[in-house]
């Protein structure tokens, strides 16, 4: 049976310069996956940086945007951080993503590297679970102009520097004042991000099907400042009212330094990310496994 995905791209995590043994390992992993994909009668494309850093230059290559324009499916080899970066860049193209976990936790890169062939074969032939996740669009407003803009799949975080004191943040939802918060920072998390930094800060987990966000203070000065669940149809505005050495992070991968009076506006993006999982995948099974929940029995 012919695969339904004809043009398949592979984007891999690769080590920095000087890590020879890690580089050799990355090359072996990517080459194994590339060979497997071609054996499935698919046209293989390697992301250009992946090919250059692993020395696998014998394959057809494209940059990430080219993959979005020309490929039917993208395999992301790495951890959740790798997937977050790729997801944001491909969101505007609608390219479905499959995660092969080479990292630690792997909430969204859920296929283990060992035995990936058994999980990947049915997906390539159309047997999979589809999992669509929303994105957040954020911009930093300064003097009435947007000076920095980014997408986020997990979260938007406004926080203090490592050597500074608490920050004071004025929070509005749809133009309505909520509170001034004195804390180490504030997290606006999507359902995807609710199991990341927001969870460690005491926030709730949101099921991916919930069209909502969670607003989570980081170490608030007032203990009554608790997490709030919001509709993702709202616009959240966070204004820097006090503190120093303050920054805004988007999925902890892009950063903007902030000044007093800056406003960070967060709204739902028009783009979404589509993950494909093996048949039988379950969000709750993922939570049980990754968070070590008790399953009962003797």
UniProtKB/Swiss-Prot annotation:
GO terms of molecular function: ATP binding; metal ion binding; NAD binding; NAD+ kinase activity
Keyword entries, A-Z: ATP-binding, Cytoplasm, Kinase, NAD, NADP, Nucleotide-binding, Transferase
Known EC number: 2.7.1.23
Pfam family, one: NAD_kinase
Chief location of this protein within or outside the cell: cytoplasm
Gene Ontology CC: cytoplasm
Entry binding sites for NAD(+): 80-81, 154-155, 182, 184, 195-200, 219, 253
UniProt-listed GO biological process terms: NAD metabolic process; NADP biosynthetic process
Active site residues according to the UniProt entry: 80
Cellular localization per UniProt: Cytoplasm
Requisite cofactors: a divalent metal cation
Catalytic activity: NAD(+) + ATP = ADP + NADP(+) + H(+)
PANTHER family from the UniProt entry: NAD KINASE
Function: Involved in the regulation of the intracellular balance of NAD and NADP, and is a key enzyme in the biosynthesis of NADP. Catalyzes specifically the phosphorylation on 2'-hydroxyl of the adenosine moiety of NAD to yield NADP.
Family named by the database record: Belongs to the NAD kinase family.
Protein name (record): NAD kinase
Gene name as annotated: nadK
